[in-house]
Regions:
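Structural core segment of the AMP-binding/adenylate-forming
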Residues: 1-63, 182
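Gly/Ser/Thr-rich phosphate-binding loop
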Residues: 148, 176-180, 189-241
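Conserved S/T- and glycine-rich ATP-binding loop of Class I adenylate-forming
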Residues: 81, 87-90, 112, 124, ...
Length: 241
């Protein structure tokens, strides 16, 4: 109702350790309760978890992309909306935060080089959630503006499938720097305190670890430093302040 969205993009489901979350019933109920009605729902069918679509307002991602045509970039004014991101609601009703295009691009591109030392062609991984500001900023927009590769990972530090998941991703994609929450490393440390999974992978391209989003306890920082043998940088943003 607040954003007056025209199109809703979703998937048939998502995967959590040990369970599948069916998205379509949740989305259907939200549409039913909303006063504002969307024009279209575009749904990505997860393999083995396909759901029925109700034409003509619901269409599959594959159908849309198979008929897509190349279009030119659209020029916009620097103060136009890039997106509206809704807060988690920890202080009441979720509030829509508006980011403008010009200032956001300048700030994010600056941080990629000057905070994270990421250059064009590097591989960067922000192990966050796109629904959070870190994910929006550092999975989607900042890598795009900087011209580097971004890793999008569906899974957890442990349980998908094991405590070596992060090391495998870093090794497979030659990740230069990782930005994640201390909770992720606490979970890995709890499951594999001796770092046995770590020894199975080649992390020779990995240069730095950045932690934020909550307090990073000294024991976890020291454990990560000793295991990774790279700088572990505990920096903070609005949640911590």
């Amino acid at each position: 109702d607040d954003s007056k969205a025209k199109i809703l993009v979703t998937a048939s489901c998502g995967f959590e350790p040990g369970r599948t979350v069916e998205y379509k019933p949740l989305v259907d109920e939200a549409i039913k309760q909303a006063d504002h009605k969307i024009d279209k729902m575009i749904l990505f069918q997860r393999s083995g978890h396909e759901v029925k679509l109700n034409a003509p307002t619901e269409v599959s991602w594959d159908e849309v992309t198979s008929n897509a045509e190349k279009v030119d970039c659209v020029e916009m004014n620097s103060n136009e909306f890039a997106y509206i991101l809704y807060t988690s609601g920890t202080t009441g009703t979720p509030k829509g935060i508006v980011r403008d295009i010009g200032g956001h691009i300048v700030a994010l591109k600056w941080t990629m080089k000057n905070i994270y030392n990421i250059n064009e062609g590097d591989t960067w991984w922000s192990a966050s959630d796109i629904g959070w500001i870190v994910g929006h900023s550092y999975i989607v927009y900042a890598p795009l503006f900087k011209g580097c590769t971004t890793v999008l990972f569906e899974g957890k530090p442990v349980g998908t499938p094991d405590a070596g998941a992060f090391w495998k991703i870093i090794s497979d994609y030659k990740v230069k720097s990782l930005f994640t929450a201390p909770t992720a490393f606490r979970a890995i440390k709890k499951e594999d305190p001796e770092g046995k999974f770590f020894s199975k992978y080649d992390l020779s391209k990995f240069e730095s670890l950045f932690l934020a989003g909550e307090r990073a306890d000294p024991d976890t920082i020291k454990w990560a430093e000793n295991l990774l043998n790279v700088p572990v940088i505990d920096h903070w943003w609005q949640t911590e302040t």
